[in-house]
From Swiss-Prot:
The gene is purC. One of its GO terms (biological process) is cobalamin biosynthetic process. It is an enzyme of class 6 (ligase). Its EC number is 6.3.2.6. This is Phosphoribosylaminoimidazole-succinocarboxamide synthase. Keywords: ATP-binding, Ligase, Nucleotide-binding, Purine biosynthesis. It comes from Acaryochloris marina (strain MBIC 11017). GO terms for molecular function: ATP binding; phosphoribosylaminoimidazolesuccinocarboxamide synthase activity. Pathway: Purine metabolism; IMP biosynthesis via de novo pathway; 5-amino-1-(5-phospho-D-ribosyl)imidazole-4-carboxamide from 5-amino-1-(5-phospho-D-ribosyl)imidazole-4-carboxylate: step 1/2. Coiled coil: none annotated. It comes from the Bacteria. Gene3D superfamilies: ATP-grasp fold, B domain (3.30.470.20), Phosphorylase Kinase, domain 1 (3.30.200.20). Belongs to the SAICAR synthetase family. It catalyses: 5-amino-1-(5-phospho-D-ribosyl)imidazole-4-carboxylate + L-aspartate + ATP = (2S)-2-[5-amino-1-(5-phospho-beta-D-ribosyl)imidazole-4-carboxamido]succinate + ADP + phosphate + 2 H(+).
Amino acid sequence: MSTGEFLYEGKAKIIYRTDDPDILLAQYKDDATAFNAQKRGTITNKGRINCAIATHLFKVLEAAGIATHFIDQPNPDQMRMRAVQIVPLEVVVRNIAAGSLCQQTGLALGVPLSQPLVDFYYKDDALGDPLLTRDRIFLLELTTPEQLEQLRQLALRINQILINFFHQCGITLVDFKLEFGMTSDQQLLLADEISPDTCRLWDDAESDPTRRVMDKDRFRRDLGEVDTAYARVMERVLAQDIYVP
């Protein structure tokens, strides 16, 4: 599919306009970043792999009643999507202690949480995407109390759907990041992507704490075999039928 006018370039995707103002085209990139883009690199075929994974997972979520911005996948590394105004909050759902949760609380890596934890981060690269309390979200007027609760409930629904789906893939969903956006007619949609870039995924067949990692932590922590891990996730995800859990 030919691309239209360049709109903007992010860390993982280039976004183009199309003939329809309500539809955008995302070109997924092989670029990899970590630590707020302080670390940069390239992962072989990451664009195609992440686009394929995100496409399949959006279809799974749509089948389960979650409205997303996904339209179709015209090429292996391209996704057509509905244009949205992104809510400036990153919604992180955690099922197992890892990453910044361990650093900030002293919880040991791998400790299962008694219930999913939903965190909200300010989507602002200049500030380092800080963790926000509910009161700070309202102080900054980033959303309303009603929409914040809607985001939380949607995130928890998506979490349960994805936990079940990844279980069928032999993968544990440790935690993941979501972004949402509003359409021109004020419909709230799941946006951005769901992929090894945005999720922590552990291989159920591996007990070794290094070998089990199937996500961007392999890049962050210089564990090697990043492209191989991403490809394994894609193979397992695409092998699963799209169904209503």
